[in-house]
Regions:
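Membrane-interface alpha-helices at helix entry/exit sites of multi-pass transporters
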Residues: 42, 77-90, 261, 296-305
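Alpha-helical transmembrane segments of multi-pass membrane transport and lipid-handling proteins
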Residues: 88-114, 128, 171-175, 300-356
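Helix-loop junctions and terminal segments of transmembrane helices
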Residues: 58-74, 147-148, 206-208, 265, ...
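Membrane-interface junctions at transmembrane-helix termini in multi-pass inner-membrane proteins
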Residues: 3, 7, 133-158, 176, ...
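Interhelical loop/hinge segments that connect adjacent transmembrane helices in multipass membrane
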Residues: 1-6, 120, 181-182, 196-244, ...
Length: 363
């Protein structure tokens, strides 16, 4: 069953990724030609700003997800209900924290980007982004349950349909109105709708669980979760410093146009890495399930295989990126004005390679 669920997760995720990445690429191209570097740059910058706020999540999602593996195997519904209730409460606290910090941080936005480079609608853009991330934390917690139960593939058809509709509507809006606020509003509405429908599906799928349990978590389970969160804090902080500070630094010390150019390289990198991460993320719950069964020897063997696989895949990817990044962007896609010199491209490739080698550890 474990292998079967992994295959289903990989196949469904791959199908979803192909469709959404193709449409997302088309949407990005139209975005660039209709709105230009300024809006592209501010979009990338705000994603990094809110990535900074997301550190407050502290790895709670991963820690709770790990704690769910064993009770799911043992069908301990009481413990599952208790964990999910704590998870819901924790994410409410995180959402409130991010909202407060986001409001405060807006006062210091000029520190990251010169006011002369900011779009005139920056106030509305900023708080629409903030609204989206806060609502996401309030509504998305149940997806960890179905992922830990190796049944994430059941959500993929719904996600594909809604993502296709969202991207097509956004493309149409950009072509007709050439305006950013409406584009963002469509994204927020879509995110809320997807989360509501997914929550309803998961609630029905696990109707035997109580998502508002009043039972207390066993002391030993508390210790395990706290230990995992403390261990994950360093990982979360490290991931942010490596992957989410680039746009902040570029915007502060160079300009918003360079952030826009950089974001195109990162988009391509993320599209390719999305296919690679499907392999690792789709087996995460299966690997956790294996650990929960106490098979340490088998777990170490699987880890060694994953580490070797990541080395081979990311080495090939690094060489490909180095050779193809600039020819693709400059000659085939959006023109040479969106290119970085090769020494910067090399830095992007090395950073991605080193991050990729950590994938089995993160898994």
């Amino acid at each position: 069953m474990r292998i079967e669920n992994s295959i289903k997760n990989i196949a469904s995720s791959l199908c979803s990724n192909i469709v959404t990445s193709l449409l997302g690429f088309i949407s990005r191209t139209i975005f660039i030609y209709t709105l230009g570097k300024s809006y592209l740059g501010i979009s990338a910058l705000l994603q990094s700003v809110f990535g900074l706020l997301a550190i407050s999540e502290l790895g709670i999602s991963t820690a709770i997800g790990f704690s769910l593996y064993k009770p799911l195997v043992e069908k301990n519904n009481k413990l599952i209900s208790t964990l999910m209730t704590i998870y819901k409460k924790a994410y409410r606290v995180i959402a409130t924290t991010i909202l407060i910090l986001g409001i405060i941080l807006y006062k210091y936005l000029d520190f990251f980007v010169d006011p002369s480079q900011q779009p005139k609608e920056i106030f509305y853009i900023y708080f629409m982004y903030l609204t989206n991330i806060v609502i996401g934390y309030l509504l998305s917690y149940k997806t960890t349950l179905i992922s830990s139960d190796q049944k994430g593939y059941k959500l993929i058809p719904l996600q594909i349909k809604l993502n296709i509709i969202t991207i097509l509507v956004q493309i149409g809006y950009l072509i007709i109105f050439k305006e950013y606020l409406g584009y963002l509003a469509i994204q927020i509405f879509s995110s809320i709708l997807i989360n509501i429908i997914q929550n309803r599906f998961i609630t029905n799928e696990y109707s035997y669980l109580n998502f508002s349990s009043k039972d207390k978590l066993p002391i030993e389970e508390k210790r395990i979760i706290i230990k995992n969160i403390l261990g994950l804090m360093a990982t979360k902080l490290g991931d942010f410093c490596v992957n989410s500070t680039d746009n902040l630094i570029i915007s502060k010390f160079v300009d918003l146009a360079s952030v826009a150019i950089y974001s195109n390289y990162i988009m391509i990198r993320n599209l390719v890495n999305g296919y690679i991460s499907i392999l690792f993320s789709s087996i995460t719950s299966s690997f956790g399930n294996l650990i929960a069964e106490g098979n340490e020897k088998k777990s170490l063997e699987i880890f060694d295989i994953l580490f070797l696989l990541s080395f081979i895949i990311y080495s090939f990817e690094a060489v490909s990126f180095l050779c193809l990044f600039n020819p693709f962007i400059g000659d085939l896609w959006i023109g040479k004005e969106y290119l970085f010199p090769m020494h910067i491209v090399l830095a992007i490739v090395i950073n991605n390679y080193l991050t990729g080698l950590r994938m089995p550890i993160i898994t």
